[in-house]
Design a protein with these regions (language model features):
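Single conserved hydrophobic/aromatic residue that forms the stacking wall/gate
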Residues: 1-9
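Gly/Ser/Thr/Ala-enriched C-terminal appendages of enzymes
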Residues: 22-163
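Short loop-to-beta-strand transition segments
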Residues: 10-18
Length: 163
């Protein structure tokens, strides 16, 4: 029984805050100063898929219809902490626009931040955003980019420029 509990603890990811913008903590960790919830999700490291990239995946969630699960109608999915692939080149596909909560162009803003173009960042509305605004974009990002970190770097770059 104790061994099963230890395995259960190891197979879970503990997040201080919400799933999209929280920080990973240890099972004995604490909530962050600005967090009001503890989220626990499956780690997913116990799942091994042979040729997972080529399978049709009828039971996997996909925001951009990469898998055939969207043909099966609405259903609940069990999501885990796996990234399922590495970082890729940024593709301008409009996927951020579908989920971004504000009326700005998030893909162009991210490109301006990566390029370090402060004038373009200001023109595209960097003063109106926070890293947490890009949490859902990061979730649906087919390029697997850490968009919240990129936005934080851009805001820090602006702060350094103003000082």
């Amino acid at each position: 029984d104790r061994r099963q509990r230890q395995m259960c603890i190891r197979d879970r990811r503990y997040i201080s805050g919400n799933v999209l913008s929280g920080k990973q903590v240890s099972p004995n960790g604490f909530l962050g100063a600005f967090h009001s919830q503890l989220t626990v999700i499956p780690e997913g490291d116990d799942v091994h898929e042979m040729f997972g990239w080529i399978m049709p995946r009828f039971n996997q969630f996909s925001a951009n219809h990469s898998y055939f699960s969207w043909l099966m109608g609405k259903k609940e999915y069990t999501l885990d902490a796996r990234i399922k692939g590495g970082e890729r080149h940024m593709i301008m596909s409009g996927e951020y626009d579908k989920v971004f909560p504000m009326d700005i162009m998030p893909e162009y803003l991210i490109k301006a931040i990566i390029a370090g173009d402060i004038d373009r960042m200001e023109a595209l509305g960097i003063y109106e955003v926070a890293p947490e605004d890009f949490a859902l974009c990061e979730f649906v990002c087919s390029s697997k980019m850490e968009l919240q970190r990129i936005v934080r770097v851009g805001l820090d770059m602006l702060r350094a420029e103003m000082a």
